[in-house]
Regions:
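C-terminal auxiliary extensions adjacent to catalytic cores
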Residues: 2-23, 27-34, 38-41, 46, ...
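FAD-binding core of FAD-dependent oxidoreductases
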Residues: 53-75, 83-105, 135-157, 172, ...
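Well-ordered mid-protein domain cores that form the structural environment of catalytic cofactors
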Residues: 108-127, 131, 142-147, 166-186
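Short gly/ser-rich anion-binding loops that grip negatively charged ligand groups
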Residues: 65, 85-89, 108-112, 287, ...
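Short secondary-structure capping/junction motifs at helix and strand boundaries
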Residues: 128-136, 214
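Catalytic or ion-translocation cores adjacent to nucleophile or general acid/base/metal-coordination motifs
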Residues: 69-84, 356-368
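Glycine-rich, flexible loop motifs
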Residues: 2-13, 19-49, 76-131, 226, ...
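Polyanion/phosphate-binding surface patch
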Residues: 50, 65, 252
Length: 507
């Protein structure tokens, strides 16, 4: 289904549709009209020699330098050359496509002053699969994601590089093969492409989408471990969580109740302790807190997706232009720091349940390290080491980037959001989280195979899916293949999809 871009209504799910699943986009006629109206106003101001930042002045520390008419014509090209200053590995194609989509939606408001050809070229690039090559590192998150967005803007000059039909080509060749005209850059055009936190925001949208799916799988893994450990299910009572009132905890407790429905544990046919350890008893409060953190981050990201992140901002009705700081990435970077920490927190609890499954003093009659041949075999002993290493890395990465500002540009840009650092480290946190949760899934399935009572319908289905990918650990074998297979299984969301067919949505 084609995504209509009109400056509003752009959700995280629509970003996924376009960035990951290559849905087509279309600029709404009203948006195109607004872009043309704003451009007409800007050109009148240029003709009148009204001073406008980044149009007929330099940028940053050079904002007081007024450009001649001849310099205005060439300035945007050199602006993009100078700012295409990134380094390192290429950003994923879905990150770049998401950033392009976000920038089109900024332009759709009609406050950016670019020529309509610029916006329409971005639309055409998305629809024909031309994705600029963008270095992942280089942005400090203000004035927007200048370095990565400049590599997108290079395509408007027929320069840079781009992916097209699976190949990395020179920008000019990619555009030619796709049948896209190169629009060039005139006054304001270049800055209108780069002066917003669109890469940060696109990466954050994708992270939140994937993290929500990961959290739902964390609830499935928790339910499996709880059944294997004969947990007391009274702490999952709806009344208990409703009386406190946190939405995330209410949601998480409900999800886990669905997963254990129909099993002996839920029906109280198994003897349990009066009170379990926190890693078993407070799962809804902890995963629920992560849900709430992601919900807040989502609200901030979707505001940014649908707002005018630009500078200067033009108001055609009032014949007005205002220079400000609507490029500042802090409204996204701070909540996204919290979102990354939330995934780490839930990963820590997952590892604690893994410990209880392995530890013969805590695992309620299961064999030590989940092996039948203790001494000769060590079972899942080393699996915990692998999880622990990843936990420590997550903890290091959970230090907030949003407070790490370093002044630049001769102190003109003396506070920046460091939002790209947040975005990059969050995906490292999530990558580790896939592995940690995969190991808990594997251990929980192993533990359940030692139990002879009836499991909840969601738990039973999850174990069936796991056994299609990883066999029961009868005797010791190299586990790195199993760990990797489980990590990929979690990333694929196969367990989640199949379990939700049985128990319904875990949202």
């Amino acid at each position: 289904m084609t995504v209509i871009i009109n400056g509003s209504g752009l959700t995280i799910e629509k970003v996924i549709d376009v960035a990951r699943h290559n849905e087509k986009v279309k600029l709404h006629p009203d948006a195109l009209k607004r872009i043309k109206t704003c451009r007409a106003m800007l050109e009148k101001k240029i003709d009148a020699h009204e001073i406008m930042y980044g149009v007929n002045t330099g940028i940053g520390e050079f904002s007081e330098v007024v450009l001649t008419d001849d310099q205005v014509k060439e300035f945007q090209k050199y602006l993009i050359y100078n700012h295409a200053a990134g380094i390192g590995d290429p950003a994923l194609i879905e990150y770049v496509r998401g950033a392009m989509l976000g920038r089109i939606n900024v332009h759709a408001h009609g406050n950016s002053g670019c020529r309509p050809e610029i916006t329409l070229t971005l639309v055409e690039m998305l629809n024909k699969g031309v994705t600029p090559y963008v270095c992942q590192k280089g942005s400090v998150g203000a004035c927007g994601d200048l370095a990565p967005m400049s590599q997108i803007a290079l395509l408007m000059l027929g320069e840079g590089q781009a992916y097209y039909k699976g190949k990395l080509l020179d920008g000019k060749d990619a555009m030619k093969k796709a049948g896209i005209s190169i629009p060039s850059l005139q006054a304001r055009d270049g800055l209108s492409i780069i002066n917003g936190s669109n890469v940060l925001t696109a990466m954050s949208a994708i992270f939140l989408y994937d993290s929500n799916n990961w959290l739902k799988q964390a609830e499935i893994a928790a339910a499996m471990s709880l059944e294997a450990l004969k947990a007391n299910m009274k702490p999952y009572s709806a009344r208990l969580h409703e009386v406190r009132g946190f939405k995330g905890a209410i949601r998480s407790a409900e999800a886990i109740r669905k997963l254990v429905e129909g099993g002996d544990l839920k029906e109280e046919r198994i003897k349990c302790k009066v009170q379990d350890a926190y890693s078993m008893r407070s799962t809804p409060q902890v995963i629920g807190t992560a849900h709430d953190a992601l919900d807040y981050a989502r609200s901030q990201v979707e505001i940014e997706l649908n707002g005018v992140g630009d500078n200067p901002v033009f108001f055609p009705k009032e014949d007005l232009q205002i220079s400000g700081a609507n490029f500042q990435g802090s409204p996204v970077s701070l909540p996204m720091d919290m979102a990354g920490a939330a995934i780490t927190m839930v990963s820590v609890m997952s590892e604690r349940r893994l410990n209880r499954l392995n530890n013969p003093a805590l695992n309620v009659g299961l064999p030590a390290f989940l092996t039948k041949g203790a001494g000769m075999f060590s079972g899942m002993m080393l699996s915990q080491y692998t999880a622990d290493m990843q936990i420590v890395e997550q903890r290091i990465l959970s230090a907030p980037a949003s407070i790490q500002s370093i002044p630049a540009a001769a102190d003109q840009e003396d506070f920046v959001s460091m939002g790209m650092n947040t975005a990059i480290k969050n995906f490292q946190i999530l990558d580790n989280a896939y592995g940690i949760l995969g190991i808990e899934f594997m251990a929980a399935a192993q533990a359940l195979d030692f139990r002879d009572y009836k499991f909840g319908k969601g738990v039973k289905k999850a174990k069936e899916i796991i056994r299609k990918h990883v066999e029961f650990l009868d005797v010791d074998r190299p586990l790195y293949k199993d760990h990797t297979a489980m990590k990929e299984l979690v990333k694929s969301c196969e367990i989640l999809k199949e379990v939700e067919k049985i128990v319904g949505s875990l949202e």
